[in-house]
Amino acid sequence: MNKALIITPTGRPIYHHEDYDKDNHWRFTKPERTYETCVVVYNDFQPEPGTYDYIIRRKGLKWNLAPEVSKIINWQDYDYIGVWDDDYATDIKSVNLALSYARRYDFRLFQQATTSFQTYDCLKHNPEFAFTETNFIELGVPFFRNDIYRKVLRFLDAYKYEASDWGIDKVLCFYLQASAHVVHDCTVRHML
């Protein structure tokens, strides 16, 4: 098991940004990826060909969809599971690099550093570091180690998520009893 899975509720065309290779958007299904992508289409949108390995059609909020999708996709076969919003830009090389750090240093949960203007200081890209340890990651583009994802699913089964502003990200590390990491050698950008 050395492949990750990104589950991404999707309802719009992919976003590109000049900082990333537009021919290698993170959702493109190219052979050099060390991950697969499952798009969960929440409206009538038809995802671009070659931008997903699996497609599921379901309506709902991302954190309510994650447990449903996890009953359909065999997530246990993956070493890391990401649950990403569809409005982020990065590329395959960046995601692969972040996953290589996670695998080498056994991260429990992590994300790539952000270059977005609206972000928390601890998540902002800092080229002085390869990665940093923190007690917080924003839940727009998180990755969870397989055993940690199991705990996230238990949390989501016990809590009925009803709004995007609840602040799960502020308590998740405490609940999981795990530190988080921000990989600064690669970045991601929130486009909205």
Range-by-range predicted roles:
Residues 80, 91-174:
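Conserved catalytic core of nucleotide-sugar-dependent glycosyltransferases
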Residues 39-79:
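Active-site-proximal specificity loops/subdomain of glycosyltransferases
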Residues 77-89:
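Short beta-strand-to-loop acidic/aromatic patch adjacent to the donor-nucleotide binding site
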Residues 1-4, 61-62, 70, 75-76, ...:
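Catalytic phosphate/metal-binding cores of nucleic-acid and nucleotide-processing enzymes, i.e., regions
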